Regions:
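Glycine-rich phosphate-binding loops of nucleotide-dependent enzymes
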Residues: 2-174
């Protein structure tokens, strides 16, 4: 299946992180009334707890989402997108509003995604995108500017001038 995250978080803010994941797992479970089966709730809870571990949120599992840091909310969204073992996930600007430390955590989550899950990343932070994707399509003013590998894009003078600025060139020697 296909899952997605949103640029603006869509979470149940009054519920706990665990409950949000429980609902995500429940929402992709087979069978309209499968929750009536004996043991279904415990299986769903176990799957939610596994997702909490996967996105490094076990320590805040029972806190309301509203009390979580912005980066933790992004991690929770990724966990919810992973519910039901999708084949493809669309990430819409997952780094928006994250601190440098939260961006590092986000990159680690992307790097830990199972190889069988493909993803499309829409991201304004080109440095993050270049670290986690295999192919890059760069748009400028709604038009295709360049396509290529992260190395090709990072080495492109036009992309650097538009999106990365001189500071990037000085830091990375390109």
């Amino acid at each position: 299946g296909l899952r997605r995250t949103y640029q603006s978080s869509l979470l149940f803010r009054d519920l706990s992180a665990r409950d949000n994941l429980f609902l995500a797992v429940r929402g992709v479970s087979r069978g309209r009334f499968s929750f009536l089966r004996p043991g279904a709730a415990s299986t769903t809870r176990a799957a939610a707890d596994e997702l909490l571990e996967r996105v490094h949120l076990t320590g805040v599992a029972d806190q309301p989402v509203a009390a979580l840091a912005h980066g933790q909310q992004r991690q929770l969204e990724i966990g919810m997108a992973l519910a039901g073992a999708p084949r493809l996930i669309l990430f819409d600007e997952p780094a928006a509003g994250l601190s440098p430390a939260e961006r590092t955590d986000l990159v680690q989550l992307f790097e830990a995604l199972p190889a069988h899950i493909g993803f499309v990343l829409i991201e304004h932070d080109l440095e993050i995108a270049l670290r986690v994707v295999e192919r890059v399509t760069v748009l400028h003013n709604g038009r295709l500017l360049k396509e290529g590998t992260p190395a090709e894009i990072e080495g492109d003078a036009e992309v650097q001038a538009i999106y990365m600025g001189e500071g990037h060139r000085e830091r990375h020697g390109s």
